[in-house]
């Protein structure tokens, strides 16, 4: 039914990937992408035989928008789940916006070098303009 790209392969990512694989009727294909592809491959091997979900892996630098865009254009996911570092949220969001791919996140972006809340309003507007943003929770906050 859907193709999910999961960016990150640390502790939180491993739990999220296991849970997604338990729902193979929803997530029929998953790509695990991280800077350390050997971790992705090891998790894929561990999961094979326990799920009907088709799992692929890839190496990606989550700080590099062009690399993220290229991977998204190649894999064509329906959605991206970001379980990488919170400092990488905006580059991953930029790539999703460029590709028109839905974005999910388990963390809250924290600018590494600044305390500027303006970024949130800017990205919410961009997502609404691309019809990728459907939550009313931010409007109520």
Residue ranges and their predicted role:
Residues 6-10:
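Conserved N-terminal Rossmann-fold NAD(P)-binding element of oxidoreductases
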Residues 13-14:
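N-terminal Rossmann-fold NAD(P) dinucleotide-binding loop
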Residues 36-38:
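Helix N-cap at the beta1-alpha1 junction of Rossmann-like dinucleotide-binding domains, i.e.
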Residues 51-63:
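Rossmann-fold cofactor-recognition segment
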Residues 61-62, 78-93, 100:
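N-terminal glycine-rich "phosphate-gripper" loop used for MgATP/nucleotide binding
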Residues 62-74:
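Conserved Rossmann-fold cofactor-binding substructure of NAD(P)-dependent oxidoreductases
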Residues 108-132:
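Rossmann-fold NAD(P)-binding glycine/threonine-rich loop
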Residues 133-141:
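Single conserved hydrophobic/aromatic residue that forms the stacking wall/gate
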């Amino acid at each position: 039914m859907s193709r999910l790209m999961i960016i990150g392969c640390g502790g939180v990512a491993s739990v999220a990937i296991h849970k997604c694989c338990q729902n193979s009727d929803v997530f029929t294909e998953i790509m695990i992408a991280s800077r350390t592809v050997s971790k992705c491959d090891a998790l894929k091997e561990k999961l094979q035989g326990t799920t009907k979900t088709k799992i692929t892996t890839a190496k990606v630098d989550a700080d590099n928008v062009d690399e993220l865009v290229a991977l998204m254009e190649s894999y064509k996911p329906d959605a991206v789940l970001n379980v990488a570092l919170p400092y990488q949220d905006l580059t991953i969001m930029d790539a999703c916006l460029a590709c028109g791919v839905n974005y999910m996140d388990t963390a809250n972006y924290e600018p590494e070098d600044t305390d500027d809340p303006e970024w949130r309003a800017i990205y919410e507007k961009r997502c609404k303009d691309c019809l990728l943003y459907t939550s009313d929770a931010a409007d109520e906050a």
